[in-house]
């Protein structure tokens, strides 16, 4: 069994990439590298969270993120409880604050929360006494997705600084895009966003990105092509003429990918809409990192839980205020 180096985040919660320093991000990525090694061994357990309780509270349905956090917690020795909101008091009219206070009375050590409203996780974090991890809030942030994407890029390219990363698709509704832009910018990458005007948030230029409205110009010379899911469930109006037309202009196929560098790599946070934002030949091709992203997700979430756990009372290596 490996012995990972101690790394402690100087905060109780991980609510977003915004506010994280470059050394904090790199520290989490370095720790996650150790967990990649651990997860490829027969014995995958560590005891950082032994005796601790982790509650996964998902107000939005998720398969991969919830499963990834559950596996991460269990591999660190935590008692993990998945709370089904569909069968909870929330469906009976209980407010988010009431839910937070009820959970807090049960004295969990870590809450992993996904919510459909931007800012809801930060609000909940102010009402509880335990560590809180944002597993995605509205169109705001998804910090662990950005961290796992960064780890995937760094392992395959050897660096992040100086790379050109094209983030393509439904930027408007994407918390993944926002967190990735913040992280990549912090670590020195050149970031482009590629989307039709209807799927670009107002003021996106203020994030220090290049804005392209065509895949042809946006992918030119890119090192990484990061596709985003078209989130039709969040679209109340007509953001695109049709799925067929969207794929024609903004779906990643082999012809469009040739605009990027010959050694460019393709990413997607999942779940994918094949034939909408990405062609199967590209998703399953030699340049795709999509399956590797899933593996990195468990390691990154273990790193986040491990780093936050060291701030818990009586934790090994814990800092006391």
Curated annotation (Swiss-Prot):
Catalysed reaction, written as an equation: carbamoyl phosphate + L-aspartate = N-carbamoyl-L-aspartate + phosphate + H(+)
Could you tell me one molecular function GO term of this UniProt entry? Answer: amino acid binding
Residues that bind L-aspartate: 92, 175, 229
Residue numbers binding carbamoyl phosphate: 64-65, 114, 142, 145, 270-271
Q: In which pathway does it act?
A: Pyrimidine metabolism; UMP biosynthesis via de novo pathway; (S)-dihydroorotate from bicarbonate: step 2/3
User: What GO cellular-component annotations does this UniProt entry give?
Assistant: cytosol
PROSITE patterns attached to this UniProt entry: CARBAMOYLTRANSFERASE
Enumerate the Pfam families for this protein: OTCace, OTCace_N
Q: Which InterPro entries does the entry link to?
A: Asp/Orn_carbamoyltranf_P-bd (IPR006132), Asp/Orn_carbamoylTrfase (IPR006130), Asp/Orn_carbamoylTrfase_sf (IPR036901), Asp_carbamoyltransf (IPR002082), Asp_carbamoyltransf_Asp/Orn-bd (IPR006131)
| GO term, biological process aspect, one | amino acid metabolic process
Q: What class of enzyme is it?
A: transferase
Q: Which UniProt keywords apply?
A: Pyrimidine biosynthesis, Transferase
Enzyme Commission number(s) from the entry: 2.1.3.2
Per the record, the similarity remark reads:
Belongs to the aspartate/ornithine carbamoyltransferase superfamily. ATCase family.
Tell me which HAMAP family the record gives: Asp_carb_tr (MF_00001)
Instruction: State how it assembles.
Output: Heterododecamer (2C3:3R2) of six catalytic PyrB chains organized as two trimers (C3), and six regulatory PyrI chains organized as three dimers (R2).
What is the protein's known function? Answer: Catalyzes the condensation of carbamoyl phosphate and aspartate to form carbamoyl aspartate and inorganic phosphate, the committed step in the de novo pyrimidine nucleotide biosynthesis pathway.
Q: What is this protein called?
A: Aspartate carbamoyltransferase catalytic subunit
Which species does the entry assign this protein to?
A: Azorhizobium caulinodans (strain ATCC 43989 / DSM 5975 / JCM 20966 / LMG 6465 / NBRC 14845 / NCIMB 13405 / ORS 571)
